[in-house]
From Swiss-Prot:
InterPro entries documented for this protein: Haem_Oase-like_multi-hlx (IPR016084), PqqC (IPR011845), PqqC-like (IPR039068), Thiaminase-2/PQQC (IPR004305)
Domain of life where this protein originates: Bacteria
GO biological process, one term: sulfur compound metabolic process
Protein name in the entry: Pyrroloquinoline-quinone synthase
Pathway membership: Cofactor biosynthesis; pyrroloquinoline quinone biosynthesis
Record EC number: 1.3.3.11
A GO term for molecular function: pyrroloquinoline-quinone synthase activity
Amino acid sequence: MSEATALSPAEFEQALRAKGAYYHIYHPFHVAMYEGRATREQIQGWVANRFYYQVNIPLKDAAILANCPDREIRREWIQRLLDHDGAPGEDGGIEAWLRLGQAVGLDPDQLRSQELVLPGVRFAVDAYVNFARRANWQEAASSSLTELFAPQIHQSRLDSWPQHYPWIDPAGYEYFRTRLGQARRDVEHGLAITLQHYTTYEGQQRMLEILQFKLDILWSMLDAMSMAYELNRPPYHSVTDQRVWHKGITL
């Protein structure tokens, strides 16, 4: 039985981009935010829970760096850490997200405490970081390729939120504006690594599954938020109105 023929680089890239049909921009929770149907509580809940994702992205990127023996790749990939953590003496994406939190009426200390992070969101983000730690560096790096679709989602927020939510301080949109350029730059690097590494049919199919795994993470995060903030069914809602869920277990 002959082996399946590998996709050409152009065909493989097209298959990767086709996964954009499952990007979380199409999740009902995000659609509601884009269309102006989200409440203040729902937007605050989204900002608070996405903060957990933001603070873990540098850990994901640090894991990739730790597993990567290629000096030139490390030199370029480390920029992602600086984008989020900030270079010495400079703010990064995490501080920009804290300012977004303030813009929607959240206290920075409450965001940092992670007390609002839903278990479903925590589990999804932790799964992503653990994957990056355990996978080979090429697979972990290419799992970031949901960035292919990120500029569209950042632009959609910049286009719609000021119109629909005048109560949000416009200064909070700095994160989205900054990420527009950073995401496009990161896509070029991540896509180059991916197209170079996956040259067999089996490898390409595995990469498509890895990208779907990342899409599942982003979608599942919004599922958890939808349960809590749209359906008013947060964890343990049937037995208490208190946030009794765990706030993170340090190992």
